[in-house]
From Swiss-Prot:
The lineage of its organism: Eukaryota, Discoba, Euglenozoa, Euglenida, Spirocuta. Signal peptide: none annotated. The gene is rpl22. It holds the Pfam family Ribosomal_L22. GO terms for molecular function: rRNA binding; structural constituent of ribosome. This is Large ribosomal subunit protein uL22c. HAMAP family: Ribosomal_uL22_B (MF_01331_B). It comes from Euglena longa. This protein binds specifically to 23S rRNA.
């Protein structure tokens, strides 16, 4: 088996104030597309997280361009890895009847994209 060194560029965006489930729903649409198609798709998706993912993928493209090959185009690159992991949770409480307090969990996530 070949032990080639593959050229990759990775970006991690941390502590985004969006739930992991909502981000994963968008990432499932985008995986395994060429960069041009993925960015075009993200531009027109009506979700809140699509703008953050758009910026992350575009940043990984510029990282690849600066580090490996300056003349590369969007059509030649593909998204090899795109994942969302849960981040720290902000815990708040909401007052309820009889002096009780119910917890509110404000979830955050980390996005990793690799081309």
């Amino acid at each position: 088996m070949d032990n080639k060194k593959y050229k990759r560029a990775c970006v991690m965006v941390r502590n985004i104030k969006i739930s992991v489930v909502k981000v994963r729903r968008i990432l499932d649409h985008v995986r395994k597309y060429s960069l041009r198609n993925a960015l075009m798709l993200l531009e027109f998706l009506p979700y809140k997280g699509s703008l953050v993912i758009y910026k992350a993928i575009k940043s990984s493209y510029f990282n690849y361009k600066n580090f490996w090959d300056f003349n590369v185009t969007l059509d030649n690159l593909y998204i090899t890895k795109a994942k969302a992991d849960s981040g720290p949770m902000l815990k708040r409480s909401c007052p309820h009847s009889r002096g009780k307090a119910f917890p509110i969990r404000k979830r955050t996530c980390h996005i990793t994209s690799m081309i």
